[in-house]
Swiss-Prot record:
Protein name per Swiss-Prot or TrEMBL: Protein MGF 360-10L
Organism: African swine fever virus (isolate Tick/Malawi/Lil 20-1/1983) (ASFV)
Family named by the database record: Belongs to the asfivirus MGF 360 family.
Biological processes annotated in GO: taxis
Known role: Plays a role in virus cell tropism, and may be required for efficient virus replication in macrophages.
Length: 355
């Protein structure tokens, strides 16, 4: 689109720092967004706003303006060089779609552009700002969310399938919720605190999922905050089973143990998920359901696990039985360099047996 003289003048103004005394001029000119002046970094073509620490490239800014039905900014960003076809992705009402078409958008949303924008924002190593922005753009935005979910559904499904036994929960989950949980897992794994807080505040209907993810990804302090401060509750043994899904989840397993979860059920869950380190840790904590565990290992043809469970050499680790309350700082201090006593006993026995 060929820029108007007015948009060119606004572009010049946005490139320069304007004293707070003249902010009223920027508001009058339409260079005001998210309670702050719109600044333009022409070298990188980024919209600068305090609400978006990483800045917004023009196409992303256009999508956000379209999602908000901000006709003035849709036209301005398009005249500054944004691709109006990106705006069409977030056009949720007929009038906004028609406006995008008037500005030159194609009549169908480009699915490749949807995926390009999604993966540009959502990837390992991304930022809190990008994750929050992704949610603003795609939540309650049916068609592009549908496109994204169809593209990455298999990946999302198997990430979540390991966390819950009830497949009906996943089958009945909306595309919006599935996408939100996927983004939360990424934020949790990369410890993006601002994004994590945003999820807690804005998606309270998914609170149980936040608890599930904290258990599964061994996020002890998040688990404690959710359980004690947010008062999110689940069946204790179910929590323990989720903690056992990923190996080396000593922190969240121990937290559930101190809350009163059944350590023998945890032992069986470790066999079910074939998590050897977790299995030895449960034995360290006093699990003694060896016959049931052997039967399960035999049933699943886990020969190595069956062999290890068949040896009568194990006993609880008394150093783990000193804590009586689920204090995350004390748990972390106790386990930060922990090596399983019973695993070392086994390897010592196995070494001598081999000799």
């Amino acid at each position: 689109m060929f820029p108007s003289l007015q948009s060119f003048a606004k572009k010049v103004l946005a490139r320069h720092h304007v004293s707070i005394d003249y902010h009223y001029i920027l508001k009058h000119c339409g260079l005001w967004w998210y309670k702050a002046p719109i600044s333009l970094d022409c070298k990188h073509m980024l919209i600068k706003l305090p609400s978006f620490a990483d800045g917004l490239d023009l196409n992303t800014a256009l999508m956000l303006a379209t999602k908000e039905n901000n006709y003035q900014l849709i036209k301005l960003f398009t005249e500054w060089g944004a691709d109006i076809n990106y705006g069409l992705i977030c056009a949720n009402t007929p009038p906004v779609r028609e406006f995008c078409w008037e500005l030159g958008a194609k009549y169908q949303v480009d699915k490749n552009k949807v995926m390009h924008m999604f993966f540009k924002l959502i990837h390992h190593g991304t930022t809190s700002s990008n994750i929050i922005l992704c949610l603003k753009l795609f939540n309650n935005n049916p068609f592009p969310t549908y496109v994204i979910i169809r593209e990455i559904k298999s990946s999302i499904y198997w990430k979540l399938r390991r966390l819950v036994e009830d497949t009906d929960i996943l089958s009945n989950m909306s595309d919006d919720d599935m996408l939100t949980i996927y983004c939360f897992i990424l934020a949790l794994q990369d410890n993006l605190r601002e994004a994590i807080s945003y999820f807690y505040q804005h998606f309270k209907h998914l609170n149980t999922w936040w608890l599930i993810c904290a258990l599964c990804f061994n996020k002890l302090f998040d688990l404690h905050d959710l359980y004690e401060k947010e008062k999110i509750r689940m069946d204790m043994d179910e929590m323990m089973c989720i903690a056992c899904t990923k190996d080396n989840n000593f922190l969240t397993i121990y937290y559930c143990f101190l809350l009163g979860a059944n350590i023998n059920q945890a032992m069986l869950a470790c066999v079910q998920f074939y998590n050897m380190d977790n299995l030895f840790f449960c034995i360290d904590l006093g699990a003694d359901a060896f016959e049931e565990a052997k039967a399960l290992a035999d049933q699943r043809n886990y020969f190595l696990m069956y062999h290890r469970l068949s040896i009568d050499i194990y006993s609880p680790d008394s150093s783990l039985l000193t804590l009586k309350e689920a204090d995350p700082k004390k748990i972390y201090h106790l386990l930060k360099n922990y090596k399983s006593k019973n695993m070392m006993v086994y390897f010592d026995y196995d070494g001598h047996d081999t000799v």
